[in-house]
C-alpha cells in the first residue's frame, strides 16, 4: 500500500506546483546548509584532522629524537665504561710494575747488605788471623829467647812451655 493513493483517496489533492516549490526550497535549504553549516563543519573537521596528524607526526619525531638521544647516551656510557676499564687495567699494570720494581730493589739491597756483611766478616777474620799470627810470632820469639837464655833439659823445657801456655791463657 502506497501512501500517495491514500492521501489522494482521502480528498487531499496532489498539487505539483507545491511539490515543485517544496523541492526547490529543500534544494536551496540543502545548498545553504552545505555552504554555511556543513562546509564550515567539514572545514573544522579537516583542520582537526590536520592538527591531529601534525601532533602525531611531531610526537613521532620527538620519539625518534628521544631514541637517538638514548642511543647516544648508551654509546657514551659504553665508551665511559671502556675508558674506566682501560684506566683500571693500566692502574693494575702500573701497580704490578711498581711492585716488581720494589721487590727487585729490595732484593738488590738485601744482596748488597749480604755482600757488605760478607766483606766485613772477611775483613774481621783477616784482622783476627793477622793478630793471632802476630801473637804467635811474638810468643815464639819469647819462647825462643827464654830457651836460648837457659839451656834446659827436656823436663825443664816442658815446664817452661807449660808455664808459658798458662800465662798466655790468663792474659786472654
From Swiss-Prot:
The terms under GO molecular function for this entry are: proton-transporting ATP synthase activity, rotational mechanism; proton-transporting ATPase activity, rotational mechanism
Which InterPro entries does this chain map to?
Answer: ATP_synth_B-like_membr_sf, ATP_synth_b/b'su_bac/chlpt, ATP_synth_F0_bsu_bac, ATP_synthase_B_chain
- Give a GO cellular-component term: plasma membrane
Q: Does the keyword Transport apply?
A: yes
Q: Where are the transmembrane segments?
A: 12-32
Q: Has UniProt tagged this entry with the keyword Cell membrane?
A: yes
Which superkingdom?
Answer: Bacteria
Q: Name one Pfam family in it.
A: ATP-synt_B
What does the record note on quaternary structure? Answer: F-type ATPases have 2 components, F(1) - the catalytic core - and F(0) - the membrane proton channel. F(1) has five subunits: alpha(3), beta(3), gamma(1), delta(1), epsilon(1). F(0) has three main subunits: a(1), b(2) and c(10-14). The alpha and beta chains form an alternating ring which encloses part of the gamma chain. F(1) is attached to F(0) by a central stalk formed by the gamma and epsilon chains, while a peripheral stalk is formed by the delta and b chains.
The entry's protein name is ATP synthase subunit b
The organism named in the record is Bacillus licheniformis (strain ATCC 14580 / DSM 13 / JCM 2505 / CCUG 7422 / NBRC 12200 / NCIMB 9375 / NCTC 10341 / NRRL NRS-1264 / Gibson 46)
Amino acid at each position: 500500500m502506497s501512501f500517495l493513493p491514500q492521501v489522494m483517496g482521502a480528498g487531499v489533492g496532489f498539487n505539483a506546483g507545491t511539490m515543485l516549490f517544496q523541492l526547490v526550497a529543500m534544494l536551496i535549504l540543502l545548498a545553504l546548509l552545505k555552504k554555511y553549516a556543513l562546509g564550515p563543519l567539514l572545514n573544522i573537521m579537516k583542520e582537526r584532522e590536520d592538527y591531529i596528524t601534525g601532533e602525531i607526526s611531531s610526537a613521532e619525531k620527538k620519539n625518534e629524537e628521544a631514541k637517538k638521544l638514548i642511543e647516544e647516551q648508551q654509546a657514551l656510557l659504553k665508551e665511559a665504561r671502556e675508558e674506566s676499564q682501560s684506566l683500571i687495567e693500566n692502574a693494575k699494570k702500573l701497580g704490578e710494575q711498581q711492585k716488581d720494581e720494589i721487590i727487585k730493589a729490595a732484593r738488590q739491597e738485601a744482596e748488597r747488605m749480604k755482600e757488605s756483611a760478607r766483606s766485613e766478616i772477611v775483613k774481621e777474620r783477616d784482622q783476627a788471623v793477622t793478630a793471632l799470627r802476630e801473637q804467635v810470632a811474638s810468643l815464639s820469639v819469647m819462647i825462643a829467647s827464654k830457651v836460648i837464655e837457659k839451656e834446659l833439659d827436656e823436663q825443664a823445657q816442658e815446664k817452661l812451655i807449660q808455664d808459658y801456655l798458662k800465662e798466655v791463657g790468663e792474659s786472654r
